[in-house]
Amino acid sequence: MGTPQSSGLRSIRVAVRKTCTMVNVWPLCSVRSSTMGSRCSKANQLTPCDSTWKTYGNVSWNTVRLASLYSSCLTRTLVMPRSTPYASVTLSCAVLTSRKPQCTTSGFRTVRIAMRSCLTWALRVMTFIAIIRAARTLDSTSNASS
């Protein structure tokens, strides 16, 4: 995941060790469908790859965009949604040169659950960032006073 290609683009590693390379900004959430074919849609702005992705545009991505500024392309979080206890979900976020992420999820029964998990992950990242910033502020304040 997040391995730079020779062209300078970044790639996302998907199920069964297959890789899709991003060719453009894609600030939409994608849910991988295991029942779909093996071609990538041009509408999804992907180069030819081994898995097909569906995109859902009616999602607010401000939170995810903000979180992406502070997250690594190598970030991987395992999520177990309460509404789908049977699904072990891997959520990852790849940050492109434009700093807009593509969040990918697998193992969901519905798009709504996938969207909720994407945003939950982003909120967790932002909460973690806020804690780190607060700790750094306190540390710098104590160093300045001493």
From Swiss-Prot:
A matching Pfam family: DUF5477
Q: Which InterPro entries match?
A: DUF5477 (IPR020148)
Question: What is this protein called in UniProt?
Answer: Gene 19.2 protein
- Species source reads Enterobacteria phage T3
Q: Which gene encodes it?
A: 19.2
